[in-house]
Amino acid sequence: MVGHRGAAGSAPENTLAALDAAIGEGAEALEFDVRLAADGVPVLMHDPLVDRTTDRSGPVRERTSEELAAADAGYRFSPDGAASFPWRGRGGGVPTLREVLERYPFTPFLLELKTVEAAEPVRRLLVELGAEDRTIVASFLERALLPFREGAIPTAASRRRIAVLWLRSRLGLPAPRIPDRVYAVPDRYRDRLHVPTVRFIEAARRAGYPVHVWTVDDPARAALLWGRGACGMITNYPARLLAERNRVFPTEAG
């Protein structure tokens, strides 16, 4: 079970509060997004602008990591459609990747790179802190993954490689060999096209690649995907899906 941007349904996404919440809800791994601040420091942020999640505005790349740390990263979070904003003033700032790696020294990560320029600074930091063996690096951008493959750091298949497998599986062809550890795929592409079909997952598994699906918040959908052979769910609500997983796969004690 992978917490999407932490537990983004319970706390402001990509903050320490959300990551803590995910661990508290039972997530076995954490997913988050990384960009570079103006001073070249890798920070957790999904969008190119800070406007959607903080009390500031403008590009992430034009603010230093200190400025981002001083922002209110919980300012925009609302669990009830903007009826309330319970995390204003208490969600903390935008964390650096270093903070996260040091805060969770044993937790597996699915780290999504949002830009090519962030690749090398992130790679160096993973190696410096000894986190390369517990981190899978994902990106839509094939070029962003190259430094990690060259350094034997696990990666997830890029968007292009996902598309290739989807087409091949539709034609009944086997999955190609890829330099990646897993397929981390959207449940739907542009809200229309189902990616983790039965054929897709079967082809990936036959070739030895587990499939993780994002973002799955509905327990019934998660159960369906598990039934197809998907390995992991990337979710905003880890506790909700863990309850469903325990129902679908009860332990002997249960």
Spell out what each predicted region is.
Residues 46-152, 178-207:
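Metal-dependent phosphodiesterase/phospholipase catalytic core, i.e.
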Residues 1-10, 197-202:
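N-terminal small/glycine-rich loop or linker at the start of catalytic domains
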Residues 18-36, 178:
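Catalytic domains of carbohydrate-active enzymes, especially glycoside hydrolases
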Residues 1-3, 30-32, 109-111, 135-138, ...:
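Hydrophobic faces of well-ordered beta-strands that scaffold small-molecule active sites
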Residues 6, 35-39, 47-48, 114-116, ...:
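Active-site beta-loop-alpha junctions enriched in small/polar residues
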